[in-house]
């Protein structure tokens, strides 16, 4: 087979055609041609740079007098022949009696393969005329009328046309699923019947294709044959390397004018365009619900049919993919086959290990163009960008609350259902997320793998370390629109907002007391149960909350990491420092609705309110005095003790 040339992947327009194109179409042409050339260079096919590419790179018009003269006398350009030929008399004579053209310095690589209907410059009949001229031994050319795509087999053209009609003539009667191509139906049957011919001896996972099986084996042996020349990063699949390279090139050739968003793949801009048009071409006939992606429709169908073929007998949970069942089994077995060579930490998924390794390297290749913040994963950057746009596309049908991530919506839904499938074997605590359970387990093991380089403090969660670092940097990215107050955590801002709204969603069934946060309600409940699971090893004192134990431990160490910049006074808790700062600023955020008096602490406001209600909760046993707050009661006790002595 003759090696691929630049002309085989190029496109040619006549001068008249070029002048008919608008600026966007001309730019698209430039981008496509440059991308084709880069792909050939990457594959090691193109050695010399064509003149056309030089013109395009310099943003010049792809027309010179010399080039225009050549196109004005069009050659017959056909991928079935090794050279270009001049037409003589008519097309038949040209193929029977051909004369090679000489272009001087302009090599064959500099010529472009035309892909318009008049590709071979046949005035009558287009491709059909060319097909008639070809010998019977040569393969014929078939073209799609809608998108002008070329095929060398009539069956391929037919298969392609079915995609435009969206018809799915091949139906699987067993489950009622339909396909537009017969080969897709055959492949689906294999999945359903579980015919997996290739089984992995390492983990027992089975595959129905040898190529997929070969790829999978690389996970266990750690083979990474594809290396990035830019940074030396190794990948076990060629597609992963190609995706990785986009980080460095930052080439986003496909731009949407409506929102200025750019993409490096044409398929991505096609998917994105549907957001603006509001088009939902994938429709469910049973419930008339429509979706903008076929994958979303497939997922939705499962809700109706409950098509879950793979059930785990241990817990009764079922899955619609065998790979999901295999992954789920590991939760029960506790198996963690993927181990980090750096620190020895083990994981139940290879992707989790890959993600963990970045902690050691410190690599953050994904940077936000808006604020310069860098991330370890592209998904984290995508999520971060929503902070700038404020977009929240995922809405809860139950209460109308919107989220910027689908995972956050899934997590939120469990509030309505009350489902908590992940339970701690040590203490019985249940969570609605596996990640929460994993983090919770660190309390029992006391493992703290995440260490602050600034002060040496260690944490059992990476998110806690990130939040802690803001103490040193002073960064407070979350600002209240109501009063302008800023916070270093989004959750604290959410809680703070409830001060303005007065919302207290979490109510104690025992005494009716309501709270802003669920954690405060959980903490409060321990007052009724008397439970104190957190014990100090130093003195044996027990607490009903882990944070109270952490605060107590500072008494033994004497550590006071939070220092006031104004007067130098140090505190063992950040909240104490915040409270102290109000002495300097004069800030009094807690105001009495009854008389307007303001306080710098919420506890002082609570005590003050009792003046209006007449409530006196603190009464000494030895005298008739009574007090509305603990501080006055404590002061009275000290005075009483002094008199006695």
Swiss-Prot record:
One of its GO terms (cellular component) is nucleus. It holds the Pfam family zf-C2H2. Gene3D superfamilies: 6.10.140.140, Classic Zinc Finger. Disulfide bonds: none annotated. CDD domains: KRAB_A-box. Residues 626-645 are annotated as: Disordered. Residues 4-75 form the KRAB domain. One of its GO terms (biological process) is regulation of transcription by RNA polymerase II. GO terms for molecular function: DNA-binding transcription factor activity, RNA polymerase II-specific; RNA polymerase II cis-regulatory region sequence-specific DNA binding; zinc ion binding. It is found in: Nucleus. Its main location: nucleus. A zinc finger (C2H2-type) spans 142-164, 198-220, 226-248, 254-276, 282-304, 310-332, 338-360, 366-388, 394-416, 422-444, 450-472, 478-500, 506-528, 534-556, 562-584, 590-612. The keyword Transcription regulation applies. Keywords: DNA-binding, Metal-binding, Nucleus, Repeat, Transcription, Transcription regulation, Zinc, Zinc-finger. PANTHER family: PR DOMAIN ZINC FINGER PROTEIN, ZINC FINGER PROTEIN 833-RELATED. May be involved in transcriptional regulation. Belongs to the krueppel C2H2-type zinc-finger protein family. This is Zinc finger protein 681. It comes from Homo sapiens (Human). The gene is ZNF681.
């Amino acid at each position: 087979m003759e090696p691929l040339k630049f002309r085989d992947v190029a496109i040619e327009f006549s001068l008249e055609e070029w002048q008919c194109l608008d600026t966007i179409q001309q730019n698209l042409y430039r981008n496509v041609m440059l991308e084709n050339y880069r792909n050939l260079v990457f594959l090691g096919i193109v050695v010399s740079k064509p003149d056309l590419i030089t013109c395009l790179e310099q943003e010049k018009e792809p027309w010179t007098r010399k080039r225009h003269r050549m196109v004005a006398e069009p050659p017959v350009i056909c991928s079935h022949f090794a050279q270009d030929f001049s037409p003589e008399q008519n097309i038949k004579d040209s193929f029977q009696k051909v004369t090679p053209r000489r272009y001087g310095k302009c090599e064959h690589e500099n010529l472009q393969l035309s892909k318009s209907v008049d590709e071979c410059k046949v005035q009558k009949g287009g491709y059909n005329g060319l097909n008639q001229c070809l010998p019977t031994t040569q393969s014929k050319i078939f073209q799609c009328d809608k998108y002008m795509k070329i095929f060398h087999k009539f069956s391929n053209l037919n298969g392609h046309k079915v995609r435009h009609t969206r018809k799915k003539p091949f139906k699987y009667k067993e489950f009622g699923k339909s396909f537009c191509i017969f080969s897709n139906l055959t492949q689906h049957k294999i999945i359903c019947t579980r015919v997996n011919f290739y089984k992995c001896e390492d983990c027992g996972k089975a595959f129905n294709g040898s190529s997929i099986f070969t790829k999978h084996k690389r996970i266990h042996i750690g083979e990474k044959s594809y290396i990035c020349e830019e940074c030396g990063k190794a990948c076990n699949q060629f597609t992963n390397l190609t995706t990785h390279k986009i980080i460095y090139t930052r080439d986003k050739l496909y731009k949407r004018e409506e929102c200025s968003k750019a993409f490096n793949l044409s398929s991505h801009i096609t998917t994105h365009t549907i957001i603006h048009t509001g088009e939902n071409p994938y429709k469910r006939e049973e419930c008339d619900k429509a979706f903008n992606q076929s994958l979303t429709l497939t997922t939705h169908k499962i809700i109706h049919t409950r098509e879950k073929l793979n059930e785990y007998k241990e817990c009764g949970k079922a899955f619609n993919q065998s790979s999901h069942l295999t992954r789920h089994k590991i939760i029960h077995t506790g198996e963690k086959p993927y181990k980090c060579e750096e620190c020895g930490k083990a994981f139940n998924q290879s992707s989790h290990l890959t993600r963990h390794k970045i902690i050691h390297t410190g690599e953050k290749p994904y940077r936000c163009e808006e604020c310069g913040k860098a991330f370890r994963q592209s998904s984290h950057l995508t999520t971060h960008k929503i902070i700038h746009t404020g977009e929240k596309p995922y809405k809860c049908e139950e209460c109308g609350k919107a989220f910027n991530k689908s995972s956050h919506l899934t997590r939120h839904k469990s509030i309505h259902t009350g489902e908590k499938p992940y339970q701690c074997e040590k203490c019985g605590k249940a969570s609605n997320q596996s990640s929460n359970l994993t983090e919770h387990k660190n309390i029992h093991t006391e493992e703290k793998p995440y260490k602050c380089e600034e002060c040496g403090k260690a944490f059992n969660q990476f998110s806690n370390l990130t939040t802690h670092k803001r103490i040193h940097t002073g960064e407070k990215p979350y600002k209240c629109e109501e009063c302008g107050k800023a916070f270093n955590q989004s959750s604290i801002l959410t809680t703070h907002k409830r001060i303005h709204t007065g919302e207290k969603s979490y109510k104690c069934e025992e005494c009716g007391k309501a709270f802003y946060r669920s954690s405060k309600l959980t903490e409060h409940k321990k007052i009724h149960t008397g439970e104190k699971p957190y014990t100090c090893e130093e003195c044996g004192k027990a607490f009903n909350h882990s944070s109270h134990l952490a605060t107590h431990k500072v008494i033994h160490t004497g550590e006071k990491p939070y220092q006031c910049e104004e007067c130098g006074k140090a505190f063992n808790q950040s909240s104490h420092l915040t409270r102290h700062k109000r002495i300097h600023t004069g800030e009094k955020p807690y105001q009495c609705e009854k008389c307007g008096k303001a306080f710098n602490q919420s506890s002082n406001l609570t005590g003050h309110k009792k003046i209006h209600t007449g409530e006196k909760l603190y009464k000494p046993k030895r005298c008739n005095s009574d007090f509305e707050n603990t501080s006055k009661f404590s002061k009275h006790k000290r005075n009483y003790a002094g008199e006695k002595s």
